[in-house]
């Protein structure tokens, strides 16, 4: 913190910070994590303390109330929506309020280092039942990723982005192996559909940073079931509505 001026820390698999079992309610584990955070905050008040916890929701609420941010995995729901399949595509768990949390400390993400890429899933398994809207087509895949970006970034709370997500990286996580080095695809910037996704991602992030309507102190209402999803933001400065049709 003092030497490198970092903004905070992300701690890996903190459910394992215990001598007992990893699940359930563990007061000792919570006290250990809170002691670590309190020490960090004594040097830098407000430093980000992010946990990859994967614990019981009640324990995650307790940690969130203490000031932690915690990862929330909704990748598979975003993948199914992008591919054009609605059975497992609800984004409701991407919103902290749906989990009964008081604080907007749920860090959700559309892609991560542990999950398959959406563009790859679209290319390999996307809904191709409608020839005029074949999800496996790169241009159509990128437009559908614009929708996942819209919801993935504007749902209230902090977000995590993975490298080249904004350009629709479509090489499998298992090519050639899960932890193998993946080639950078700088040429994606010259591909028109990918470049459009890049620009749209920037616009959406700018909206979130520039307008209080998309901040933590807005009234947020959402229907994120089924193919057609919508969000409504109500704030004294401006109201906003976002709608996405994930159907094919």
Predicted regions and their residues:
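Active-site-proximal helices and loops of the catalytic beta/alpha 8
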Residues: 13-115, 150-154, 158, 165-238, ...
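N-terminal/domain-start segments enriched in small and hydrophobic, helix-friendly residues
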Residues: 7, 14, 25, 121, ...
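Substrate-gating cap/lid region and adjacent catalytic-acid/histidine neighborhood
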Residues: 142
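Conserved interdomain hinge at the start of the Helicase C-terminal
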Residues: 145-147
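An active-site-proximal structural segment forming one wall of the substrate-binding cleft
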Residues: 1-10
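A solvent-exposed, charged loop/short amphipathic helix patch at secondary-structure junctions
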Residues: 120-138, 178-184
């Amino acid at each position: 913190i003092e030497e490198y001026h970092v903004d905070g820390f992300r701690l890996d698999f903190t459910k394992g910070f215990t001598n007992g079992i990893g699940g359930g309610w563990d007061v000792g584990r919570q006290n250990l994590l809170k002691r670590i955070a309190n020490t960090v905050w004594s040097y830098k008040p407000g430093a980000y303390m992010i946990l990859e916890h994967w614990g019981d929701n009640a324990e995650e609420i307790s940690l969130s109330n203490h000031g932690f941010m915690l990862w929330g995995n909704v990748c598979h729901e975003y993948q199914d929506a992008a591919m054009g399949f609605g059975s497992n595509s609800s984004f409701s768990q991407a919103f902290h309020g749906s989990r009964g949390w008081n604080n907007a400390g749920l860090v959700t993400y559309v892609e991560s280092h542990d999950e398959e890429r959406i563009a790859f899933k679209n290319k390999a398994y996307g809904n191709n039942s409608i020839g005029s809207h074949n999800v496996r087509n790169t241009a159509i895949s990128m437009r559908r990723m614009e929708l996942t970006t819209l919801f993935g970034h504007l749902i209230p709370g902090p977000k995590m982005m993975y490298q080249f997500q904004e350009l629709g990286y479509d090489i499998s996580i298992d090519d050639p192996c899960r932890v193998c080095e993946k080639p950078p695809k700088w040429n994606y910037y010259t591909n028109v559909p990918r470049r459009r996704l890049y620009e749209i991602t920037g616009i959406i992030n700018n909206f979130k940073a520039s307008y209080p309507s998309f901040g933590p102190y807005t009234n947020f209402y959402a229907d994120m079931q089924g193919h057609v999803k919508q969000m409504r933001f109500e704030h004294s400065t401006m109201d906003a509505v976002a709608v996405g049709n994930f159907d094919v």
